[in-house]
């Protein structure tokens, strides 16, 4: 009560934040009349002035009003787009390192240009992060024009670029790219053998588009670079063959003489828990598996791997559905992103689950992989000095953004009032009744011409609905992972009169749905592409035709059919005589294509404008959801496709008690309410109690998923600190500064390790383990301890430690004289890197094994998290000891042969780089309980540890 009164008097935190920014908006608007008078050159010159002021120590904050005003003026001149006042506020929120929640259609892409330009002035780099390569390329080409016009450089990072192209893109003032590419580049850099090969700069400022998708939906997906193991794949087929012979059972509660008065019993061979996404064998099931696999005890430690793969095979059959969780294409299992409905080529589930699904579908089984480098998105993005983000739906996860990323969410008001009514949910008892009602509503709205966007949660459901619409003779487009190639094109035209579009989840996110159609999109359809793509096609065709050595007339005729209107340009170039300047020809062809394209856009503008008015009169775009998602945020994203920029629209969800969300999390309560109300078959219900029950079910799932993400980051924070130590050590070695001092430090610590392991205080020296001491000293340092009885009597822990150190220094001095300074420094550098990389790889495997079993500590009344921290620390310290020992041992024992062998030794480092040009696509697993995304080194690729050998002969043994 008191809190509500205070809020009424002083406003909410969000209102106070917005109130603080409006005066700055006024200052920006006051600068506009003066900037309008400037020529393009004078406007561009402002950037040089800002850079000069920044170099003299002026802060970016103080330059914000002027820089934003300049950026807005450039947007008007280059794109014909002027930032609205609310977009200026969005830009300020991003610059201050917060999340801007802006509704769909409010121009988030344009907003990002403001903080990007301001922070780009510093020259320290700005990363604009998007969810896929298409958006990264589109935004860099589109919005990048503003930055280029103002004199800033723009780069783009997409899959398939060479290292030199990536380095150039990262060196730009503003770099567009995907979260996966940024993350993998960081991991790849930290596996390289030369600092000059690094592609990334220190992390300065990141603007994350669709921040909820990247920082929350993908937060359970670690990025992993991995190499294959030798394991046979036969075991997956053998286990898969027995799963259909097992009978699914149920958990039954029976009366019992216990504290709760109830006891659980199990029927069948296995039970399934859909909430936890797990499947477990019953006692009967264990006996049956043992009989089928001809083993005595499934729980014998020697059979743990068989048990693990049996459980994964159970999950594959009982919990993962084809055309829902994955599709099979060209004998390959491809994961479907549960949040976007997009296919994720190259991504794989971990811990043998993907192999189990491949066996189930009879697809080719790929080997499991071993981790070489890994990081989560949470820890990657927390490395930026300043992080910000924008999305249409962040407020429901505001608490998580604040707790994990220290990011506050500011809700930006819409430029025009939202006119979209969100109608109450309609609930039916069965899915059949629900789909009948959905088809009825689609038919009714389609007949009057109102465009409809139908949201489904899986490919299976979208195709089922499509079949029903075909039977009714209703024309429609289906947009799911199987038809993703034309995604942006289909979504852009979903607002045309009479259009019916079925889309899985948030497919097409990032593309605006314009009522009446998009003139640019229609022009692209008529033009068969963009001016850029058509020009690329033309140049390829022209060069191919030239090679046929045809007469000029035939040459022009052969191209005229496919590229009408371009021939006068080509003829003009040919008449100039001499060699054809292909670059000049390409420029002129692009200009002609742009002119033709603009004519098509102009032709479509009045058509789309007239259709826009018709669609507005019909009520705008209607969103029809066929199922609630686990997250309210995903439902809000679907609704947000309608009602953009003050346009009318509407939304409604149709549900049934057979939907996954209600069936797993809320069915009993909802079913009880419906029974009490006497709902008959075919009859729908819209009731506040039902809506609240559904929201409570969603909140339960959201809380559960938040706990999983929080749990993951708490565990990964331990690894993050260890990763920082290793990567910092690698960078120092690559920097070459004081590398010999680093080695002597390791040598001194190695002596300390031996003393700590074998020397016992307050115990006579004769009782020490001298066999262990002499063997270890001989193995590590390469010299023999000459011990006499007289010496034994005089040895103390202190003088023994000092004697060992002195002898080790003398031995190192001998090696230095033998090799010379330059060669010794080079040997130290290469050996240190090879040993660190090999030991780090083994350490990651040990950590994976530790994670798998740590949960069992809870049964011993121990906190698994604390146990994990303690054990992970011990594993790390053991690894550091092994690194010291192995580096010292190799330096003291290494032999350098002929000059030819030394040249081969020099070649070992560059081979390390080759692996990154040969790897497959990154593999990030979707959010099925902590899963992994992997990018693998092939069996015959150079080993990522840098040895110069093939992977199968080195770390892949």
Swiss-Prot record:
Keyword flag Signal: no
Cofactor(s) essential for the protein: Zn(2+)
Domain of life: Bacteria
Pfam families, A to Z: P-loop_SecA, SEC-C, SecA_DEAD, SecA_PP_bind, SecA_SW
CDD domains in the record: DEXDc_SecA, SF2_C_secA
Gene3D superfamilies linked: Helical scaffold and wing domains of SecA, P-loop containing nucleotide triphosphate hydrolases, SecA, preprotein cross-linking domain
Binding-site list for ATP: 87, 105-109, 512
Cited HAMAP family: SecA
Family note: Belongs to the SecA family.
Protein name per its UniProtKB record: Protein translocase subunit SecA
Species of provenance: Geobacter sp. (strain M21)
């Amino acid at each position: 009560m008191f809190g509500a009164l205070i809020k009424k008097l002083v406003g909410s935190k969000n209102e106070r934040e917005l109130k603080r920014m409006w005066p700055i908006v006024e200052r920006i608007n006051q600068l506009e009349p003066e900037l309008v008078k400037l020529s393009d050159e004078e406007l561009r010159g402002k950037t040089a002035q800002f850079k000069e002021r920044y170099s003299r120590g002026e802060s970016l904050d103080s330059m914000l009003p002027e820089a934003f005003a300049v950026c807005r003026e450039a947007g008007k001149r280059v794109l014909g787009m002027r930032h609205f006042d609310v977009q200026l506020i969005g830009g300020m929120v991003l610059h201050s390192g917060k999340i801007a929640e802006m509704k769909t259609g409010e121009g988030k892409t344009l907003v990002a240009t403001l903080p990007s330009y301001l922070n780009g002035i510093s020259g320290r780099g700005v990363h604009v992060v998007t969810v896929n390569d298409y958006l990264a390329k589109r935004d860099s080409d589109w919005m990048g024009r503003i930055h280029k016009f103002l004199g800033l450089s723009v780069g783009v990072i997409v899959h398939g670029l060479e290292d030199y192209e990536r380095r150039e893109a990262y060196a730009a003032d503003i770099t567009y790219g995907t979260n996966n590419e940024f993350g993998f580049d960081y991991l790849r850099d930290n596996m390289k053998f030369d600092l000059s090969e690094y592609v990334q700069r220190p992390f300065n400022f990141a603007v994350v588009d669709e921040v909820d998708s990247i920082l929350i939906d993908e937060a359970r997906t670690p990025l992993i670079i991995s190499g294959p193991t030798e394991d046979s794949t036969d075991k997956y087929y053998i286990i898969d063959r027995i799963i259909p012979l097992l009978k699914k059972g149920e958990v039954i509660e029976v009366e019992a003489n216990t504290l709760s008065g109830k006891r659980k019993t199990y029927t069948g061979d296995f039970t399934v828990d859909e909430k936890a996404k797990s499947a477990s064998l019953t006692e009967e099931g264990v006996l049956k598996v043992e009989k089928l696999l001809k083993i005595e005890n499934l729980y014998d430690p020697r059979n743990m791997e068989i048990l693990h793969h049996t459980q994964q095979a159970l999950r594959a059959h009982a919990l993962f559905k084809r055309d829902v969780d994955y599709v099979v294409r060209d004998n390959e299992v491809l994961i479907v992103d549960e949040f976007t409905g997009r296919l994720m080529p190259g991504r794989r589930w971990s811990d043998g689950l993907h192999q189990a699904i491949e066996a189930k579908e009879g697809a080719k089984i790929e080997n499991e992989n071993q981790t070489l480098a890994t990081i989560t998105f949470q820890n990657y993005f927390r490395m930026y000095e300043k992080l910000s983000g924008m999305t249409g739906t962040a407020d429901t996860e505001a608490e998580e953004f604040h707790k994990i990323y220290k990011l506050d969410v500011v809700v930006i008001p819409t430029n025009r009032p939202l006119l979209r009514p969100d109608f109450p949910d309609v609930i039916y008892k069965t899915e059949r009744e629900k789909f009948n009602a959905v088809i009825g509503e689609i038919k009714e709205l389609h007949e009057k011409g109102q465009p409809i966007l139908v949201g489904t949660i899986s490919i299976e459901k979208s195709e089922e609905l499509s079949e029903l619409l075909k039977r009714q003779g209703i024309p429609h487009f289906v947009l799911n992972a199987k038809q993703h190639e034309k995604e942006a094109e289909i979504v852009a035209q979903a607002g045309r009169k009479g259009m019916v579009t079925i889309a899985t989840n948030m497919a097409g996110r990032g593309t605006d749905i314009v009522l009446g159609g998009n003139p640019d999109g229609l022009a692209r359809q008529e033009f068969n592409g963009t001016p850029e793509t058509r020009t690329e096609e033309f140049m390829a065709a022209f060069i191919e035709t030239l090679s046929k050595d045809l007469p000029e007339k035939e040459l022009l005729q052969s191209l005229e059919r496919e590229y009408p209107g371009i021939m006068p340009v080509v003829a003009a170039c040919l008449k100039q005589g001499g060699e054809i300047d292909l670059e000049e020809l390409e420029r002129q062809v692009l200009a002609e294509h742009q002119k033709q394209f603009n004519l098509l856009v102009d032709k479509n503008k009045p058509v789309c404008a007239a259709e826009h008015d018709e669609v507005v009169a019909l009520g705008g775009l209607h969103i029809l959801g066929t199922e609630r998602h686990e997250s309210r945020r995903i439902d809000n994203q679907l609704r947000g496709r309608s009602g953009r920029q003050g346009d009318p629209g509407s939304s409604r969800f149709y549900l049934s008690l057979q939907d996954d969300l209600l069936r797993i999390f809320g069915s009993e309560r909802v079913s009880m309410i419906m029974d009490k109300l006497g709902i008959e078959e075919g009859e729908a219900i819209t009731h506040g109690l039902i809506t609240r029950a559904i929201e409570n079910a969603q909140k339960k799932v959201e809380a559960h998923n938040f706990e999983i993400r929080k749990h993951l980051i708490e565990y990964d924070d331990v690894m993050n600190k260890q990763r920082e130590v290793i990567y910092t050590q690698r960078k120092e070695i690559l920097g070459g500064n004081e590398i010999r001092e680093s080695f002597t430090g390791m040598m001194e610590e190695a002596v300390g390790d031996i003393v700590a392991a074998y020397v016992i205080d307050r115990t006579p020296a004769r009782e020490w383990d001298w066999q262990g001491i002499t063997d270890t000293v001989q193995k590590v340092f390469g010299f023999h301890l000459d011990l006499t009885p007289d010496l034994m009597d005089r040895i103390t822990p202190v003088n023994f430690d000092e004697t060992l150190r002195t002898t080790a220094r003398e031995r190192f001095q001998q090696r230095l004289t033998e090799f010379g300074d330059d060669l010794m420094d080079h040997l130290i550098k290469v050996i240190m890197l090879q040993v660190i990389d090999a030991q780090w790889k083994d350490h990651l495997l040990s950590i994976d094994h530790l994670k798998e079993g740590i949960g069992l500590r809870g049964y011993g009344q121990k906190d698994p998290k604390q146990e994990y921290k303690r054990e992970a620390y011990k594993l790390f310290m053991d690894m550091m000891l092994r690194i010291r020992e192995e580096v010292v041992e190799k330096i003291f024992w290494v032999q350098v042969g002929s000059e030819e062998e030394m040249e081969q030794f020099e070649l070992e480092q560059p081979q390390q780089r080759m692996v990154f040009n040969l790897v497959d696509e990154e593999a990030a697993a979707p959010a099925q309980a902590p899963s992994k995304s992997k990018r693998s080194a092939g069996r015959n690729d150079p080993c990522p540890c840098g040895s110069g050998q093939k992977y199968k002969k080195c770390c892949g043994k």
